[in-house]
From Swiss-Prot:
Annotated Polar residues bias: 292-311
Source species: Xenopus laevis (African clawed frog)
GO CC annotations, alphabetized: nucleoplasm
CDD domains in the record: Deltex_C, RING-H2_DTX1_4
Catalyses which reaction(s): S-ubiquitinyl-[E2 ubiquitin-conjugating enzyme]-L-cysteine + [acceptor protein]-L-lysine = [E2 ubiquitin-conjugating enzyme]-L-cysteine + N(6)-ubiquitinyl-[acceptor protein]-L-lysine
Protein name: E3 ubiquitin-protein ligase DTX1
Disordered as annotated region, ranges: 224-319
């Protein structure tokens, strides 16, 4: 179907000479779950045009899609950079046959929980279109690693484990761009300067090993689409039982429909640490079982604890923690997560061990033992609906913080990527009042220079709160506020200690935000939003630095910066309340998910994150 992993070479090497067969080009970005997600055909045409002009330059995506205004692609390093948050993600240039779905402009999409449509990954879209063109009644996605059946007659997708149905649709769009010539040698995303060596960072190693093992599985399996009725679905699993007082967390569904709700598929098998002190808990994608691959090693005598368990594992054989390791008999491959499946596919020995359980909550605390935080008044803060003031004129806001430059240097504007001595890339794209497209200015504190029209475009795409943030150094001009929906923040001291802070008690923060209707400052005004997992409990040590963090978190809460409405990186659900770039510790007595203690760098790191949001000690509210 495609040439997976075919990417741009480093340092502007040739992207293909004339004479080879034509190929369809699809640009993709790597999300936090290790899945490559396609850009739209319009964006891909824009990137290809920029590539022909300068194969080592940068591409501002906001020039063709206003929703992508903060995003820039660096063709030299093959990364996508988000200017307002500093988030960096790898990108790649993938190739497909002209007769495939991208070449025809065909997009297959599934309906998410919010009622909006999400496109399938490119290769899944191609597989669905191929089956559709051959008039197959359905397509089983099991051999692609997803426990779903796609029914073409009813145009729905069925989860083989839970029987849940989702609507799907086929629509026509702009065809993806064509390129002629030889395809560059496959490699991971470019690193270094012409070294030709694969990247050795943990993320690259993880993705490359996963890709290699997945290709080995798919090479031994062929998608079989019989003409008869689909195979019988297994009975739905019994509802999980959860301890009282604990809320069920969201996990990856393991399906082509993205990241579903809890109970729709495989369970997660833990978090992936990123070594930065802010490791985001990521559910490992649970692939559906493959025929003949459910003969994992029996746990046998490995089901013991402590040193006896480790002693029974042969030397050199990795131990694979499994959550649902109870009783006797063979263990279903899905329980071992993607890691177990890949190791079994490679023929490596695996010993299953019982996975440790995170300690999410402290022991029960009576009301008499709960005390206020020293030096902080009250125990609760509430935010209400934002009362929208008269919208400030974007041109006036930008002029307040920017100074005119009469003779700009001949260098790039890092917002539109055009030269400062030429007109802004947003000339003709943005309606503006009395600002010449060639006018250049510099910000007062940091002296970074841009076309004046470019910060106006960024302000128009933001919260319009009268503040401005430099996309280069992140310096904030004015007081930045967010779009956090109404809710309540409680805080108090409990008589228990966090791991690594045995000399003090613990500050517990409880956030509670109800579901509601989106306002004019939100992504989809007038549409409902969900609030999953609330109330959320977070923990800080009750010492000087912990209390300082609490005071700044209170200021961030008042400015509506803690949460936002967006798409969950855990479940893929859109129009839901998500964390907003300020990390919290939600695991009380352990650090198995990366969201707990001990973590000696956490307090310093969260202070840095608050500073980036413009929340600093001297500017915080007097609590």
């Amino acid at each position: 179907m495609s040439r997976p992993g075919v990417l741009l070479p480093v340092n502007g090497h040739n992207f293909g000479s004339q004479g080879g067969p034509p190929r369809v080009v699809v640009w993709e970005w790597l999300n936090e779950h290790g899945r490559w997600r396609p850009y739209t055909a319009t964006v891909c045409h824009h990137i290809e045009n920029a590539l022909r002009e300068d194969g080592r330059g940068r591409v501002a995506l906001g020039q063709v899609d206003a929703q992508l205004t903060p995003y820039v692609i660096d063709l030299q390093t093959m990364h996508q950079y988000r200017q307002d948050t500093g988030t960096i993600r790898p990108v790649r240039r993938n190739f497909f046959e002209p007769s495939s779905a991208p070449g025809k402009g065909i997009v297959w999409e599934w309906e998410n929980d919010a009622g909006s449509w999400t496109p399938y990954d490119t290769e899944i879209c191609i597989a669905i279109q191929n089956a559709y063109e051959k008039h197959h009644p359905y397509l089983d996605l099991t051999t692609l690693g997803f426990c779903y059946l796609v029914h073409f007659h009813s145009m729905c997708q069925v989860n083989r484990q839970t029987h849940r149905k989702r609507r799907l649709r086929r629509r026509m769009d702009l065809a993806y761009p064509l390129t002629m010539g030889s395809i560059p040698k496959s490699q991971s995303w470019p690193v270094g300067s012409g070294s030709g060596l694969p990247c050795s960072c943990p993320q690259c190693l993880l993705v490359n090993s996963t890709r290699a093992a997945s290709n080995a599985i798919l090479a031994s399996q062929r998608i079989k689409v019989p003409s008869g009725p689909p195979p019988a679905l297994p009975p739905p699993p019994p509802p999980p039982i959860h301890p009282s007082g604990l809320r069920q967390s969201n996990t990856y569904s393991g399906g082509a429909a993205g990241w579903g709700r809890t109970g729709e598929g495989m369970r997660s098998t833990g978090g992936i640490r990123n070594g930065s002190g802010f490791s985001r808990s990521q559910s490992v994608p649970g692939a559906a079982p493959y025929p003949g691959q459910n003969n994992l090693n029996r746990p046998g005598e490995q089901r013991t604890s402590g040193s006896s368990s480790r002693a029974s594992i042969p030397p050199g054989v990795p131990a694979l923690p499994v959550k649902n390791l109870n009783g006797s008999g063979p263990v279903h491959p899905a329980l071992a997560g993607m890691t177990g499946i890949l190791m079994c596919a490679a023929g490596l020995p695996v010993c299953l061990t019982r996975a440790p359980k995170p300690i999410l909550h402290p022991p029960p605390v009576s009301k008499e033992d709960i005390k206020p935080v020293s030096g902080v008044s009250g125990i609760c803060r509430k935010t209400k609906k934002k009362h929208l003031k008269k919208s400030k004129n974007p041109e006036e806001v930008v002029r307040r913080y920017i100074q005119k430059v009469k003779s700009p240097p001949d260098e790039d504007c890092t917002i539109c990527m055009e030269r400062l001595v030429t007109a802004s890339g947003y000339d003709g794209v943005l309606s503006h009042r009395g600002i010449r497209a060639e006018l250049v200015g510099k910000l007062g504190k940091c002296n970074h220079m841009y076309h004046v029209l470019c910060p106006v475009a960024m302000y128009n795409n933001g919260n319009k709160d009268g503040s401005l943030q430099c996309p280069t150094c992140k310096a904030i001009y004015g007081e930045k506020t967010g779009t956090q929906p109404p809710g309540k923040m409680e805080f108090h001291v409990i008589p228990h200690s966090l791991p690594g802070f045995s000399d003090c008690k613990t500050i517990r923060i409880v956030y509670d935000i109800p579901s509601g209707m989106q306002g004019p400052e939100h992504p989809n005004p007038g549409k409902k939003f969900t609030a999953r997992g609330f109330p959320r409990h977070c923990y800080l040590p009750d010492n000087d630095k912990g209390r300082k963090v609490l005071r700044l978190l209170l200021a961030a809460w008042e400015r509506r910066l803690i949460f936002a409405i967006g798409t969950s990186s855990t479940t893929g659900e859109s129009n839901t309340v998500v964390w907003n770039e300020i990390h919290h510790k939600t695991e009380f007595g352990s650090n198995l998910t990366g969201h707990g203690y001990p973590d000696p760098n956490y307090l310093d790191n969260v202070l840095t994150e608050l500073h980036r949001q413009g929340v600093m000690e001297e500017r915080s509210l007097p609590y």
